[in-house]
């Protein structure tokens, strides 16, 4: 079938959880289906990133759209104006009339069998009017977004920020409920998320697919050795749950660890670290902040303990599966391991207070047989159960079933149409490339 895949960014560099999940899923789906990847484009990606897109799609359509940069005057002005909007800011900033028009044009041309909206944000550009979108639709939910905002609100101590986060949480809850009910099918990435959407939003056609990991890519190379007391955290540092996690770890957990192991070090790997974290690394030589790296594996290999101190989040944590495949000893909060079929004390250690988390990290750093046993069991689990091929096959079946159900409800011809491959470039309009 011909799938129109909606996104808010190109996938290269494949450097954060949502990109990793989509990239691996699409690479597998592309072998069985025709993929048109329609995305917003902030102009940062170059020719190489666009060329790389054909690893996961047959046609690339880029719609120019640049959200405000964080911490600028324009950014704060948008936050202020958003107080009067029914949409949460995380959705509002991706509204694009041009993307909406491109969706309508392609669907009405009869060249699309099924549309997949990847994350909640692109849904703001899916037309609401009856007849504008006459193909089956699937919403791919990597998280329950409202739950993330609820947890932000719950851990925030600043009164002004807490009020703002409360409003964003309630807006997101309303919007997410509406969107989940609008689509023909919703796909979650864990059974917990599926159940929450069923129970909280009253969504009937919601399914779940497991999280996968590329076990050929993520495996120990033997070229790097763990530093005895090195603790590693990886993740995009411009994602709010990761920002909160590393602040929590450096302020409340790391000092407790260093009381027992004074030479313990922390390596934070991930793009766009905030100024406060960079300033900490300048003042404290035991903290290393790398920023974006081309290959996270060598940093993971050097970890004697891999930590996931998340207090906020939803969906599942790809970073845990990657660390498991790398045979790392992992310490996580319950929220950090949420949605993953793994057991405390078997594949990792769970701890939900600063004191217990610090104690668990100290155990791993001091007890090498324990660390090795956790890493060995973790790697065996992901290699046996969580390859991307199996995950993509399940997602593909959900799409096929959604299309088949739609065909029984309509007499419209939704068979795949033959297309003429073409390439055009227009500075003010979408850039279309096909292979």
Give, region by region, the residue ranges found by the protein language model.
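Acceptor-binding helix/loop patch of EC 2.4 sugar-transfer enzymes
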Residues: 8, 74-92, 135-174, 236
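N-terminal subdomain of nucleotide-sugar transferases
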Residues: 1-63, 108-110, 421-435
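A short, well-ordered alpha-helix in the C-terminal region of glycosyltransferases
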Residues: 370-385, 394-397
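Conserved catalytic-core segment of nucleotide-activated headgroup transferases in glycan assembly
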Residues: 199, 203, 208-302
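Donor nucleotide-sugar binding/catalytic pocket of nucleotide-sugar-dependent glycosyltransferases
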Residues: 62, 136, 146, 166-220
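Conserved acidic donor-binding segment of nucleotide-sugar-dependent glycosyltransferases
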Residues: 348-355, 363-368
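Acidic donor-binding loop of glycosyltransferase active sites
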Residues: 184, 286, 292, 301-315, ...
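Short hydrophobic beta-strand element within catalytic cores of glycosyltransferases
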Residues: 319-322, 329-333, 349
């Amino acid at each position: 079938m011909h799938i129109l895949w909606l996104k808010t960014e190109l996938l290269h560099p494949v450097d954060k959880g949502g990109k990793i999940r989509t990239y691996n899923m699409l690479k597998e789906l592309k072998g069985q289906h025709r993929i048109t990847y329609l995305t917003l484009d902030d102009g940062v990606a170059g020719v190489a990133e666009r060329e790389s897109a054909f690893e996961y799609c047959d046609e690339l359509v880029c719609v120019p759209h640049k959200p405000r940069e964080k911490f600028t005057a324009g950014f704060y002005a948008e936050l202020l104006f958003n107080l009067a909007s029914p949409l949460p800011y995380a959705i509002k900033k991706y509204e694009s009339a041009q993307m909406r028009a491109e969706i309508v044009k392609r669907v009405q041309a009869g060249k699309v069998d099924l549309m997949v909206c990847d994350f909640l944000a692109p849904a703001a550009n899916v037309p609401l009017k009856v007849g504008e979108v006459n193909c089956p639709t699937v919403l791919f939910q990597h998280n329950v977004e409202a739950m993330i905002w609820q947890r932000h609100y719950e851990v925030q101590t600043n009164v002004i920020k807490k009020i703002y986060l409360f409003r964003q949480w309630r807006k997101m809850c309303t919007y997410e409920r509406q969107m989940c009910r609008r689509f023909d099918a919703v796909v979650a990435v864990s059974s917990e998320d599926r159940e929450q959407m069923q129970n909280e939003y009253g969504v009937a056609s919601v399914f779940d697919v497991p999280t996968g990991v590329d076990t050929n890519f993520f495996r120990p190379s033997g070229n790097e050795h763990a530093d005895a007391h090195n603790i590693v955290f990886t993740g995009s540092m411009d994602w709010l749950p990761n920002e909160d996690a590393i602040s929590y770890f450096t302020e409340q957990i790391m000092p407790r660890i260093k009381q027992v192991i004074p030479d313990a070090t922390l390596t934070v790997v991930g793009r766009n670290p905030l100024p406060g974290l960079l300033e900490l690394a300048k003042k404290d030589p035991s903290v290393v902040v790398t920023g974006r790296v081309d290959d996270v594996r060598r940093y993971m290999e050097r970890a004697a303990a891999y930590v996931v101190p998340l207090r906020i989040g939803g969906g599942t944590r790809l970073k845990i599966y990657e660390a498991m495949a790398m045979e790392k000893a992992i310490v996580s909060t319950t929220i950090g391991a949420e949605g993953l079929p793994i057991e405390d004390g078997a594949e990792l250690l769970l701890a939900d207070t600063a004191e217990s988390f610090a104690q668990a990290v100290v155990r791993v750093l001091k007890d090498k047989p324990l660390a090795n046993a956790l890493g060995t069991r973790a790697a065996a689990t992901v290699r046996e159960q969580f390859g991307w091929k199996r995950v993509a096959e399940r997602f593909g079946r959900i799409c096929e079933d959604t299309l088949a159900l739609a065909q029984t409800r309509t007499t419209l011809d939704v068979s795949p149409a033959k297309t003429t491959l073409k390439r055009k470039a227009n500075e003010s309009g979408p850039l279309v490339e096909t292979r």
